[in-house]
UniProtKB/Swiss-Prot annotation:
It comes from the Eukaryota. Residues 1-26 are annotated as: Disordered. This is Dynactin subunit 2. Pfam families: Dynamitin (PF04912). GO terms for biological process: mitotic spindle organization. The lineage of its organism: Eukaryota, Metazoa, Chordata, Craniata, Vertebrata. It is a peripheral membrane protein. Signal peptide: none annotated. Part of the dynactin complex that activates the molecular motor dynein for ultra-processive transport along microtubules. In the dynactin soulder domain, binds the ACTR1A filament and acts as a molecular ruler to determine the length. Modulates cytoplasmic dynein binding to an organelle, and plays a role in prometaphase chromosome alignment and spindle organization during mitosis. Involved in anchoring microtubules to centrosomes. Residues 101-132, 357-402 form a coiled coil. Its main location: cytoplasm.
Length: 402
């Protein structure tokens, strides 16, 4: 039974079925709506803003050439032929449209570049022992170079403007030349309307100054290689000063030939440690525990070693080795200290190289930003000129209406 405190409240319907209203879609439509909403708001989907008027003007009075096109679904050895597309738009035959000199110049230059690339591939594939044909790749390359010079000698860039000639082999150089021309335009425009007598040249606030600092990476690599060679030479001199003369009859120097200074010191230190009395007692105790023939054989060798002459020879060898070791021990700390210094120097050089790479990357980014800034400034000047013209026209119309 309902709570009596809600019995006489206004706006409550009595004796009617309960109705629960909601703004949500049915369950079958909710999944589809959520999928569409996720697709519209997803960052993985690229939303293109297309201007239909601009697209219509671009493809206006254009038609698709279907000569030689075959899309039939037949089973045969010959492959079907589709539409051909290239990097540049080329006018088809029989369309009634005629190529402009600028389009023809760009098409010829692009075809010459493609032909040069094909000839270079042929030159790399042809072997020296191949028989010379009527038109060799070398002769074809020379003809292509002459054709390129002839194309450049037409001086179409002066007639068609700076946007006609584009160097496909060096696009960055072409953009740099175009930027230089754009920077020269404001100074020419300011100098043209000057009719008053020339004044003393003063500081120009609108001047743009570009400073480029470039260091050849080959020079850094050459200096680094020279330093490494000098360090290796000094290290070789140190090793030649402290190393001992090779003696094939000396058993203590076995295994120490042809090794570095550090490895030689480690080998000699290990052999000197074997001569310690405590180590010899441990070795003797282990040998005594060896059973059978091994113990007898070691006993025979021990008796030979205990001979006075043999002992004197061993003492003499050890004494001579210790004499040489004194000279090595005196210079060894300096060598170790220099090796540690070389290691620190190599670490500093590696960090310096990383800083140079980061600086080079930052310089490239600054160049790109400066290039974009120049383009934005040019666009803003053009837009400002258009706005001023529009205001002038509006003021003229207002004056005429008055």
């Amino acid at each position: 039974m309902a709570d009596p405190k809600y019995a006489d409240l206004p706006g409550i319907a009595r004796n009617e079925p309960d109705v629960y209203e909601t703004s949500d879609l049915p369950e079958d439509d909710q999944a589809e709506f959520e999928a569409e909403l996720e697709e519209l708001t997803s960052t993985s989907v690229e939303h293109l803003i297309i201007n239909p008027n601009a697209a219509f003007e671009k493809f206006k009075d254009k038609r698709l050439g279907t000569d030689g096109v075959d899309f039939s679904d037949r089973i045969s050895k010959s492959r079907t032929t589709g539409y051909e597309s290239g990097e540049y738009e080329i006018l088809g035959e029989g369309l009634g449209a005629k190529e402009t000199p600028q389009q023809r110049y760009q098409r010829l230059q692009h075809e010459v570049q493609e032909l040069i690339r094909d000839v270079e591939q042929i030159q790399s594939a042809v072997k020296e022992s191949a028989a010379e044909e009527e038109l060799t790749p070398m002769a074809l390359a020379r003809q292509l170079e002459g054709l390129k010079q002839q194309l450049v000698s037409c001086h179409l860039q002066k007639l068609l403007g700076p946007t006609a000639a584009i160097d496909f082999a060096d696009p960055e150089g072409a953009l740099a030349k175009r930027l230089q021309q754009q920077l020269e335009v404001p100074s020419v425009k300011k100098a043209a309307p000057a009719k008053s007598p020339p004044k003393a040249p003063g500081p120009t606030t609108d001047a743009l100054t570009f400073e480029l600092f470039w260091r050849r990476p080959e020079q850094d690599q050459f200096s680094q290689t020279a330093k490494i060679a000098e360090l290796e030479k000094r290290l070789a001199q140190l090793e030649a000063m402290v190393r001992c003369e090779p003696d094939s009859q000396n058993p203590l120097l076995v295994g120490a030939e042809g090794t570095s200074l550090v490895e030689t010191v480690q080998i000699l230190q290990a052999k000197v440690n074997i001569l310690d009395a405590a180590v010899l007692d441990q070795v003797e105790a282990r040998l005594q525990r060896r059973p059978g023939s091994k113990v007898n054989e070691i006993a025979k060798h021990k008796a030979i070693v205990q001979d006075a002459d043999t002992q004197s020879k061993i003492h003499q060898v050890v004494y001579e080795m210790m004499q040489r070791w004194d000279h090595m021990a005196s210079s060894l700390p300096d060598v170790v200290q220099r090796l540690l210094t070389l290691r620190d120097l190599h670490e500093q050089a590696s960090r310096f190289v990383q800083v140079l790479v980061h600086l080079d990357t930052t310089q490239q980014e600054v160049d790109v930003v400066q290039r974009l800034l120049a383009e934005v400034q040019k666009t803003m000047k053009e837009n400002l000129a258009v706005v001023e013209d529009n205001f002038a026209e509006v003021e003229a119309r207002i004056k005429r209406l008055q």
